């Protein structure tokens, strides 16, 4: 347990499970020269994924997030900056706001939602989006790391649809408009819609 051999094995499994869905114009592999600025955007870049629930739970001694891995790989000669790009509400906010637009809501429910808890959260989302776009525009390389998290990639419930939560599609669209070579990395254990796929030059899928 936790031997060098085991660590190499799980690293190999993780690498082999990744799928390069798209790589136009040979955007990948990235060439981060000394002194360049790299923007890592998306909450999943800094999130811990191993502590799942139920049969998916792993008692990991440690986990290297994508953001940590990028910083470790590039070393001190490259400036790596991070922005979440979107806001993940706490459990109370999430219970009041339906990110996946369930059709059972009435017009009255929707109006109440948007004027009470939705307004403040939407302002935070727009601020996070603006921060991410500004960071992307000032960087040489842009990497978006998004997808699902344990609020949606769980056992015991069905997703209403296959849309990305937390307004991620809007964030990705804005990043691709600002920096067409933005690399999109998805972390998910189930399919998701990717309406921006035609615009993206590089898409990497990870489980």
Q: Regions from the language model: what does each represent?
A:
Residues 2-4, 8-207:
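C-terminal non-catalytic regions of proteins with extracellular/luminal or membrane-system context
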């Amino acid at each position: 347990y936790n031997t060098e051999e085991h660590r190499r094995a799980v690293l190999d499994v993780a690498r082999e499970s990744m799928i390069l869905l798209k790589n136009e114009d040979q955007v990948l592999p990235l060439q981060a020269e000394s002194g360049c600025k790299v923007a890592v955007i998306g909450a999943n870049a800094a999130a811990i994924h191993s502590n799942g629930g139920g049969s998916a739970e792993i008692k990991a001694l440690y986990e290297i997030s994508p953001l940590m891995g990028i910083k470790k790989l590039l070393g001190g000669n490259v400036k790596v900056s991070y922005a979440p790009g979107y806001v993940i509400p706490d459990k109370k906010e999430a219970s009041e706001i339906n990110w996946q637009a369930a059709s059972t809501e009435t017009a009255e429910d929707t109006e109440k939602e948007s004027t009470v808890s939705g307004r403040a959260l939407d302002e935070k989302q727009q601020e996070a989006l603006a921060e991410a776009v500004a960071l992307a525009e000032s960087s040489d390389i842009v990497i978006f790391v998004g997808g699902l998290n344990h609020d949606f990639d769980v056992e015991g419930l069905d997703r209403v649809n296959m849309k990305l939560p937390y307004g991620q599609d809007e964030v990705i669209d804005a990043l691709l408009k600002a920096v067409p070579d933005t690399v999109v990395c998805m972390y998910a254990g189930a399919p998701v819609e990717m309406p921006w796929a035609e615009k993206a030059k590089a898409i990497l899928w990870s489980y």
